[in-house]
Amino acid sequence: MTVLQEPVQAAIWQALNHYAYRDAVFLAERLYAEVHSEEALFLLATCYYRSGKAYKAYRLLKGHSCTTPQCKYLLAKCCVDLSKLAEGEQILSGGVFNKQKSHDDIVTEFGDSACFTLSLLGHVYCKTDRLAKGSECYQKSLSLNPFLWSPFESLCEIGEKPDPDQTFKFTSLQNFSNCLPNSCTTQVPNHSLSHRQPETVLTETPQDTIELNRLNLESSNSKYSLNTDSSVSYIDSAVISPDTVPLGTGTSILSKQVQNKPKTGRSLLGGPAALSPLTPSFGILPLETPSPGDGSYLQNYTNTPPVIDVPSTGAPSKKSVARIGQTGTKSVFSQSGNSREVTPILAQTQSSGPQTSTTPQVLSPTITSPPNALPRRSSRLFTSDSSTTKENSKKLKMKFPPKIPNRKTKSKTNKGGITQPNINDSLEITKLDSSIISEGKISTITPQIQAFNLQKAAAEGLMSLLREMGKGYLALCSYNCKEAINILSHLPSHHYNTGWVLCQIGRAYFELSEYMQAERIFSEVRRIENYRVEGMEIYSTTLWHLQKDVALSVLSKDLTDMDKNSPEAWCAAGNCFSLQREHDIAIKFFQRAIQVDPNYAYAYTLLGHEFVLTEELDKALACFRNAIRVNPRHYNAWYGLGMIYYKQEKFSLAEMHFQKALDINPQSSVLLCHIGVVQHALKKSEKALDTLNKAIVIDPKNPLCKFHRASVLFANEKYKSALQELEELKQIVPKESLVYFLIGKVYKKLGQTHLALMNFSWAMDLDPKGANNQIKEAIDKRYLPDDEEPITQEEQIMGTDESQESSMTDADDTQLHAAESDEF
């Protein structure tokens, strides 16, 4: 006996949606063995891919000629995951042997999935250093579907400056319709099909197929719908969608269905019961509140007419009616497939109190496709009204709660102009015929327009939110950190108090060197989303700067226990051992992070800094160059190269690399400070002072900038100005031995020996063990007159060694060295 394709497909998607990947793979293999079709091939490859076996999906699809857009896209996705970028590009856009496809060609070929295809192609272009082409693909993808976030995020990360106001908007109604899957169209039953009895060739229900009737087809998400081979389809296609049918076969499955009384409260989109903690508002005003005495509006159906969708465009059928007495809708953008409730169509709530016009569910994936769209895979098999349903009628009826009597409600015309008939306690509707339509004067245009307007309003609300988040993220990627903090802090509280938003704010504080604030924000992220790994590498570096070894140890332990395949976890572990000056162990952990994700630029940068601490400068250079190869806009790597060249006294190269980092992050006072020091080393003292002044304007309390400006003033024999600068610096870092040592040098030049000796003594008291040998050596010889003794190059003030080898433990002392070491 030939395996029926549709019920098997339904079972496979049921298993996939319940994460039973082994079962899904097994059934998909059986289906593909039975039916060698592109559809079965795609379904099997999807099972492999979702179960984490991308290589299996790749080899399966590679071994067969993929002609459908779904197979091509999945094969390209596998290629990208397996780092076969050239092959993935050829599949999507053609190659050397094929004609290169334009964006319009891709849109024509891939249809609704073109936005995802272009986003994937843009990723390939960016990974192969063709940023201009990648940018075009991302922009086209966003123009097709402004609901996508990752293309916008990628545009910001490659240095583009997309306008969120122009990106997250609908350019036309067609653009709005294309953004939504076919299943998001509002349902309105068509009375013209109410008497249609679908025929079936299945005259008997075998015992082994009864269990198939028990499948909860609501879990089959409509976005996975495939074109079904007509030769395998035995049942009429113009019947109800499985999204509206929870159990069983035929129209009798809706008999004696009971709907719960909607709770009184604010109604946003689909009736009084629609409001829940999961109901997004997205800027939509709540409708009027129903009175506490509302009836339950229950209705029992013994022979419910089939339900279809009204197309999004074109005039509705004259006999289309609004179904009476449905429960409230699920929340907007809710996931289908996890509920056994019957999907509501159009709920109208009546009460003696304030009149409430409840509206259809909006943008919910649980609503069925329009009639002009292809039916779902399994929609035809489970909707027969033949004798096969009688065998299971008793069993099916037991799955519903007992019938609850309805309360009487008056017939009243609501704001939408829809008149509903009286509902009696014992009323059972067997048929909606033309007499009901003519007597009730039911209008179909108003609910459709109302539903569409609410759909668009909900989408516009989301667009408004994305615009604000986009502005904040764009400002952060442009390193306008204060602006980013201001924008993101004004988001609604329920969006502000989420891990993603708080991580961006914490990163902004980190870039501003406000480590205490960053630590506060990241600790809040850990409290509300202790499962979040993304962004924790920045948190670990923040704790490294603050020298909070206990908190850093706890963080690294938790992250590595939670996800050993996360580069962020190993970066945190490396920072933990780096803080303990266990540099060899830290290097191993950073190398492990690179092994887990070879495209993780931050791990290369941390490893490079660690090699600098162990004086392995050649290895450090290689690490920083690899970080730049992975991400050319990773300014920390450019800074690391400049720091190494400075240590090697290659000042021109150092200035060039520092300047490159500054071009990426023009708001960094630390980078300006280092450029000023290099300029002074190149005998450009006046230019160096100007650069340091700019750095202090950006961050007036940056101790590193003030210390270097005082040092340059001292070297230029401007002793009084240097002394004034150092006195201000002493208020910021009162326990920094270097400050007192330089003050002593100034007093010595001014001839005030007793004050010089006093400050030298304080410097030694702050560093009694001599861990800071720079008290005698760290002031660069270029800062000193010719009569001063030379010092060794290794102990220059710019070196990272002093920040790690310093004996400072107080929080005030760490500010100078934390900022001085590097920004990471």
Swiss-Prot record:
Changing residue 821 to A: Abolishes binding to MCPH1. Residues 326-341, 362-371, 380-390 have a biased composition (Polar residues). The modification Phosphothreonine is found at residues 205, 209, 244, 313, 366, 430, 446. Residues 348-361 have a biased composition (Low complexity). One of its GO terms (biological process) is protein ubiquitination. GO terms for molecular function: protein phosphatase binding. The keyword Cytoplasm applies. Its main location: nucleus. TPR repeats lie at residues 6-35, 38-65, 67-99, 115-145, 465-495, 499-528, 533-563, 567-598, 601-631, 635-667, 670-702, 704-734, 737-768. SMART domains: TPR. Residues 395-413 have a biased composition (Basic residues). Pathway: Protein modification; protein ubiquitination. One of its GO terms (cellular component) is mitotic spindle. Keywords: Cytoplasm, Cytoskeleton, Nucleus, Phosphoprotein, Repeat, TPR repeat, Ubl conjugation pathway. InterPro entries: TPR-like_helical_dom_sf, TPR_rpt. It comes from the Eukaryota. Residues 287-422, 781-824 are annotated as: Disordered. The modification Phosphoserine is found at residues 291, 339, 379, 386, 426, 435, 438, 821. Phosphorylated. Phosphorylation on Ser-426 and Thr-446 occurs specifically during mitosis. SUPFAM superfamilies: TPR-like. It is found in: Nucleus; Cytoplasm, Cytoskeleton, Spindle. Belongs to the APC3/CDC27 family. Homodimer. The mammalian APC/C is composed at least of 14 distinct subunits ANAPC1, ANAPC2, CDC27/APC3, ANAPC4, ANAPC5, CDC16/APC6, ANAPC7, CDC23/APC8, ANAPC10, ANAPC11, CDC26/APC12, ANAPC13, ANAPC15 and ANAPC16 that assemble into a complex of at least 19 chains with a combined molecular mass of around 1.2 MDa; APC/C interacts with FZR1 and FBXO5. Interacts with RB. Interacts with FAM168B/MANI. Interacts with MCPH1. Component of the anaphase promoting complex/cyclosome (APC/C), a cell cycle-regulated E3 ubiquitin ligase that controls progression through mitosis and the G1 phase of the cell cycle. The APC/C complex acts by mediating ubiquitination and subsequent degradation of target proteins: it mainly mediates the formation of 'Lys-11'-linked polyubiquitin chains and, to a lower extent, the formation of 'Lys-48'- and 'Lys-63'-linked polyubiquitin chains. The APC/C complex catalyzes assembly of branched 'Lys-11'-/'Lys-48'-linked branched ubiquitin chains on target proteins. PANTHER family: CELL DIVISION CYCLE 16,23,27, CELL DIVISION CYCLE PROTEIN 27 HOMOLOG. This is Cell division cycle protein 27 homolog. It comes from Homo sapiens (Human). The gene is CDC27.
